[in-house]
A protein has these predicted regions:
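A hydrophobic, small-residue-rich beta->alpha segment in the mid-to-C-terminal subdomain
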Residues: 143-182
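General beta-strand structural signal in soluble alpha/beta enzymes
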Residues: 1, 21, 60-62, 70, ...
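Extracellular/luminal Protease-associated
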Residues: 48-92
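Short alpha-helix capping/helix-loop boundary micro-motifs
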Residues: 3-4, 43-47, 130-132
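N-terminal low-complexity or amphipathic/hydrophobic leaders
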Residues: 1-39
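Acidic/histidine-enriched, glycine/proline-rich intrinsically disordered or flexible terminal extensions
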Residues: 183-206
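A contiguous pocket-lining binding segment that forms or flanks enzyme active sites
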Residues: 90-91, 96-146
Length: 206
């Protein structure tokens, strides 16, 4: 996926709290400032999340994967973490790479494209609205699962189906590994399971 994890090996699971950023221009910046003042929220969307995120949220920030523009640093991440959020996914950069790998953030993985020491100049234009991450549309409230192996987004309505599939896949892989260790079947019959072994797997599962 091209994302790096500040906490390698730590899996991120939660609900998507989305935000989208664009390069600034004077009229857009003025409009954003007006909306923020009228709504009494911080126009810096990471700061808004540090005030509004709910426990279990995963902040999902679309920055277009652009080099040289980042979302936040240590302070912003700490604010979001203190709200009980599960982590952050940034289709762009972040600051304070060394600090964000500190043990203080051991349970707060940040999946990001790159790190950059400069303060971002990009402007938040949408909050809790559809965003695009790696060519995938993400809606607010979608379930997020991410680690070093990749990032998955799916509608919350599919949670039970996805969990059932994950459980079955894990059980099948365990069954296949046991068959390999027993050395009683050919590899081609184990991976994928032959009809005979598939039937045996289903019998054991039930």
């Amino acid at each position: 996926t091209g994302f790096e994890n500040t906490q390698p090996g730590k899996r991120l699971v939660g609900r998507a709290l989305t935000m989208r950023f664009l390069p600034p221009r004077p009229d857009l910046t003025e409009a954003a400032l007006t909306l923020a003042k009228e709504g009494n929220w911080d126009r810096r969307y990471y700061a808004r999340a540090a005030e509004e995120a709910n426990p279990g949220d995963v902040v999902v920030a679309e920055l277009g994967g652009s080099d040289g523009h980042n979302l936040f640093g240590d302070m912003g991440a700490t604010g979001i973490q203190m709200r009980g959020a599960a982590g952050v996914i940034i289709d762009g950069g972040m600051r304070d790479y060394t600090g964000l790998r500190d043990e203080r953030f051991a349970d707060f993985p940040i999946l990001h494209k790159f790190s950059d020491p400069h303060t971002t100049a990009w402007l938040g234009v949408e909050y809790n609205a559809p965003v695009r991450i790696g060519g995938v549309t993400v809606l607010p409230g979608d379930i997020v699962v991410g680690d070093n192996g990749g990032i998955f987004f799916f509608p919350s309505s599919l949670v039970e189906r996805v969990l059932d599939y994950a459980d079955e896949s894990a059980a099948r892989e365990k069954f296949q590994l046991q068959l390999l260790e027993n050395k009683e079947y050919r590899f081609r019959d184990i991976y994928p399971l032959s009809p005979e072994l598939q039937a045996e797997f289903e019998r054991l599962r039930n």
